[in-house]
């Protein structure tokens, strides 16, 4: 391995050490500029040790490295960045073109090390300024190899130095600012879990109840009354979605259990064909849509059930048996949980069940 390759590897390792030891960009570290100035001066001093340094056979184009502070202040930040990136890129092309004209020699080895320093500077500037389109500035043609080394030193002492010292702090702060991703839209989904629990977990899953009337009664005109409650709707709201007199009037325990009493005037049949297993909560709290009525017992004081048991229908598709509780006749005597004797219930005084 040649000495040039070893020096290039050493410079790359030095840049990597600067990058790892400092959280900022390499161009924001002042040690990088000092290192490049020191190395370029040392490399140029070694050129005098090479014997027989002849001029180049073909002149190479180098950037104009003269610097004017007044002209520099009038330029915008973007034009300054393009000017410096263009100058460093053009210098790298000139060094590579000059090295391509030479046979392996002392000068060729020094030009290889010089190209490594220029690449290091170009990479650091691109990391700070970005890969902008270089601005084609003024150029000069040179045959003297010393002009290659002097061009790098003048760039470092002039435009690059002023850029890093004057514009550098602002660019470094702008580059190191954390980029916080702000969501473009906020979800407007309102979950029912945020509402206070007013029904004590009575109903928590989907259920549907279908009521059909077969004869004259209070609800004879309602041929297909259907109630659908979404998951957790009754569990998280403060009032019941269905507040109709005569429906699920005095339930005690789960609706799909055996203790529920459905009080109606002339409603004959209540089909619960759409009740899925586990649709109702297994608690024993009363689901009272007409507040003020005490829960009715399942057995009368005399030991007889107030209503005949409901016939069970055959199940289909492996579903649980569906209950069809019958509504009692309005003249049926029902026990009262507080009174010692049964109390007779009568239909509502308003007769809305006349057939038209």
Swiss-Prot record:
A single Gene Ontology molecular function, please? Answer: cytokine activity
GO CC terms, sorted: extracellular space
Q: Major place of localization?
A: secreted
> What residues bear carbohydrate chains?
197, 206, 235, 249, 256, 336, 351
The record ties this protein, via InterPro entries, to:
4_helix_cytokine-like_core (IPR009079), EPO/TPO_CS (IPR019767), EPO_TPO (IPR001323), Thrombopoietin (IPR003978)
| Cellular location(s) | Secreted
Region (Disordered), start-end ranges: 291-356
Its induction, per UniProt?
Expression in the liver and bone marrow displays diurnal rhythmicity (a circadian rhythm that is synchronized with the day/night cycle).
Report biased composition (Polar residues) as residue ranges: 330-339
Annotated keywords: Cytokine, Disulfide bond, Glycoprotein, Hormone, Secreted, Signal
**Mitochondrion among the record's keywords?**
no
Show which residues constitute the signal peptide: 1-21
| A Pfam family hit | EPO_TPO
Q: What is known of its domains?
A: Two-domain structure with an erythropoietin-like N-terminal and a Ser/Pro/Thr-rich C-terminal.
Name this protein carries in UniProt? Thrombopoietin
Q: Which organism is it from?
A: Mus musculus (Mouse)
Question: What gene, per UniProt, encodes this protein?
Answer: Thpo
